[in-house]
Amino acid sequence: MIRKCLVLFLSFALLLSVFPMLNVDAANRPLAKIPGNSNPLMDHKLGADPYSLVYDGRVYIFMSSDTYVYNKDGSIKENDFSALDRIQVISSTDMVNWTDHGTIPVAGANNKNSGRGIAKWASNSWAPAVAHKKINGRDKFFLYFANGGAGIGVLTADTPIGPWTDPLGKALVTHSTPGMAGVTWLFDPAVLVDDDGTGYLYSGGGIPNESDPASIANPKTARVIKLGADMTSVIGSATTIDAPYLFEDSGIHKYNGKYYYSYCINFAGTHPQQYPAGEIGYMVSDNPMGPFTYKGHFLKNPYTFFGVGGNNHHAVFNFKNEWYVVYHAQTVSKAQIGAGKGYRSPHINKLVHKEDGSISEVQGNMTGIAQLSNMNPYTRVEAETIAWQAGVTTEPTQASGGPISNLNVTNIHNGDWIAVGKADFGSAGAKTFKANVATNVGGNIEVRLDSETGPLVGSLKVPSTGGMQTWREVETTINNATGVHNIYLVFTGSGSGNLLNLDAWQFTPNTGGNTITKVEAENMKIGGTYAGKISAPFDGVALYANADYVSYSQYFANSTHNISVRGASSNAGTAKVDLVIGGVTVGSFNFTGKTPTVQTLSNITHATGDQEIKLALTSDDGTWDAYVDFIEFSL
């Protein structure tokens, strides 16, 4: 997973030359992901050793937490991998617009992650692998990670983005695990859940003796071991995978009933032509435990495509009936400092299986994958959903109404911008644009089409909200936004500091009616002793006892609304859910029976401004549970 890359020392003056002073009359330029391209997947942060998880129409990419490390003079060091104690997560439905889900603070030994580390025994979290499996009818997610080269740990969650817990309190696999002796580097996990629900964990790497040609040619340090039904235990002994010229980076996928084990070929010694150094080779078997037979290679070293090399790390996945490979390359760091220095970023390109089962050579490039579907601008869009950007970063937020591990866009200066690809405004077009913002000084958000200097269709004045985590929804009118366009939000304002933070945004359609605001229960704050997420009869939240609730903050310009909630009871009884706005109970929803229904409370009056909306139990008699799907109303 970790190899040294080209060392290039930069002076502080040169570093500053890469970041010229902003011309306040012009928008900033993107760093590495250029509008129209899909690679790298993001350039506002780094991410290495990518692994994919496809779930519920989204692809999630989990990555090691590459972070710039600095010399005393302010120049960027060569990556020493000391910051790999967290896991980065992003996701997308269309392969262009990626939502930043922040970091998972995995390693917890020696007060790592400021004491928030989940695995208190682990000092590192390298090269994640992720799997989904239904256990006892419930969706469960499993995050495997390497504690350096000493073993593999596992975390579990009920959603792909957490919250994550450590079910074991120790490593799942170590050198003491049967069959794991002799593995030089016990890291770089990959995981397969087969069609029958059985899980398999692949790992390993390294050359036992780099001065021995036989050891270089057949390191025999890759392993596969069967997982227990709970995915957090192992069964039996690990089996050796005799991958020729193995270096690291286990990968696994299944295609047409065959099992494909793939890996990074090592750099040591002299290789026969069929084992090119630093490329991704692959083997095929009829059994997930092997034996595997070497068939060839399909992904060249990143240097071939981008002029900056280093190790090769990949994962193969199928998304919406097409095959892809995600891999890392040092393209963002090259764009920022002129050299990779070992700092990596995720890329995706298409992968093709030929009729005979062999894999075609993948063409790595900055173009990437064309957007798979248009975006709907009339639903809430998290601001950290970004196709392209200039100047911004993201941070954890206190704003409500977003997903678990919600972020906001920050570090916003005059001329910075964010953009999303291919939003479909329809023939009627947009009427208004609203955004959830927080700011001390205020500023403006220009809404432009197709470029940062494209047609201006609206301008949103952002007043001071009284704090950078004091949130308020503001709105403006939109003109001449119809059809399919890329949307650019360009930030303007005075001063040299952070102008504002942006949590989410949404357009309203120009149909003559009011916009519909819909908030999913599973994205709200969950409170009470027993409340928890459910996946049946819908993805939502179960309220099991009095004082259980879900809530979020909503800005109201008007004081009267019709408010609808979709819900159900756990049985034939009637589940009563109170609607509380601003601390005042304004009505109740009564859901009878297990079939979900939408109920509406009409002409509800309440206070204006920022108000807490809460759906709560106060009259539970112990004979029923309430299931809540979403709340919906017209602004």
From Swiss-Prot:
Residue ranges annotated for the CBM6 domain, each copy included: 379-508, 517-634
EC id: 3.2.1.55
Active site: 49, 248
Site feature Important for catalytic activity, responsible for pKa modulation of the active site Glu and correct orientation of both the proton donor and substrate, where: 188
Molecular-function GO terms, alphabetical: alpha-L-arabinofuranosidase activity; carbohydrate binding; metal ion binding
Chain positions recorded as Ca(2+) 1 binding sites: 382, 384, 406-407, 503
GO cellular component, one term: extracellular region
CDD domains found in the cross-reference section: CBM36_xylanase-like (cd04078), CBM6_xylanase-like (cd04084), GH43_XynD-like (cd09003)
Family: Belongs to the glycosyl hydrolase 43 family.
Name under which the protein is recorded: Arabinoxylan arabinofuranohydrolase
Encoding gene per record: xynD
